[in-house]
Amino acid sequence: MDDRKFSVLIAGGGSTYTPGIVLTLLDHIQKFPLRKLKFYDIDGERQQRVADACEILVKERAPEVEFLATTDPEEAFTDVDFVMAQIRVGKYAMRSLDEKIPLKHGVVGQETTGPGGIAYGLRSIPGVIGLVDYMEKYSPNAWMLNYSNPAAIVAEATRRLRPHSRIINICDMPIGIMDRMAQIVGLKDRNDLVFRYYGLNHFGWWTDVRDKTGKDLMPALKQYVAKNGYWLGDKDKDTEASWVSTFKKAADVYALDPSTLPNTYLKYYLYPKYVVEHSDPNYTRTDEVEAYREKHVFDECDRIIAAGTAADTHFKSDDHATYIVDLCTAIAYDTKQRMLAIVPNDGAIENIDPEAMVEVPCLFGANGAERLAMGKAATFQKGLITEQNCVEKLTVDAFEQQSYTKLWEAMSLCKIVPDASVAKEILDEMVVANKDYWPELK
């Protein structure tokens, strides 16, 4: 490695994930040296609570690193090497509607899947495109690592609208599952695994998992998942109830195709009736997040600020943050590390549309992602992927063309919506709810 130090901007500085990312950057500062750390958010008040706590963290652990929090795009995006984008357009108020409106109609209400994911996607596209434009204007040589949801729709939009931008779309969900896999087979973490995986974001399958010696771990993993899903028993005692349910339900998703291991989000598409029956339309995942994660993170920020020290902080590194830092390091030092990303298919999955934005292993280096070939999708997976990818493309069509019909088609095609009349009822309600965020549909 050389003597370079990097300037990093976290766009969406008020996110509850920000302290974990900061802590991870500081923990890995020998591997990925920093000269400057900046936060950017359009909600200055929310960001400031996080920033004041994180500034204490930075000053105590790496006083040589310059720290800045701002709501000014020019100040934020000037002189940066990496932008970590984690915005939520409409905040939790809109996420709550994304979940609760479909549930009123007996349809899965979820942040990134189904009608809720489509609604969120339409809000997110201009927000992420705006960040890309700021980066290209003020730091044209920077890389953006985008993990703003819904990643699949955002990735399709950036492919079309900013095809030459230095943006890498990523998601931490498979990473978290792989850490669980490592625990199931008694390994330290996901970095001890060598894997093959393919699909769309929140919509994929592992076809092979091995350790570094080449030992096939699939038989042991399948035996465990068939009985327990990805639930880790006593190790999950502090895990939120909705996630425990999701990890356990992976056993039923696995049963549909015992030749692979599934992403947990497939439960929404394959068992929507079960999901709706086990949902409370008056208390959804948003309410759980606000009661648990939001409260915990902001209480801890306030405690650090009041104490004037972060020496005894409860914040810690997590899958989400470690993955992002590993990716920055791979690009900065051209390591060719193998990691998952959402990229144009271009033959990676042989029998899927070459323009589809697929999630596959890539080698990361100074020029970004080099996708690896995963062969052909099986018939079951091919059918699911093709349908869902068309939903994502129609959503971006709707944005580009400001088309009500395209958005209705997207919701009608979505596997978890029973028919076009229900899709229209949900859509009409969502048009009103999103009037301040969506383009005016014709």
UniProtKB/Swiss-Prot annotation:
Cofactor: Mn(2+); Co(2+); Ni(2+); Fe(2+)
Domain of life: Bacteria
Site location (Increases basicity of active site Tyr): E111
Residue numbers binding NAD(+): 6-72
Keyword Iron included in the entry's annotation: yes
Protein family: Belongs to the glycosyl hydrolase 4 family.
Activity control note: Is inhibited by EDTA in vitro.
Name recorded for this polypeptide: 6-phospho-alpha-glucosidase 1
Pfam families: Glyco_hydro_4 (PF02056), Glyco_hydro_4C (PF11975)
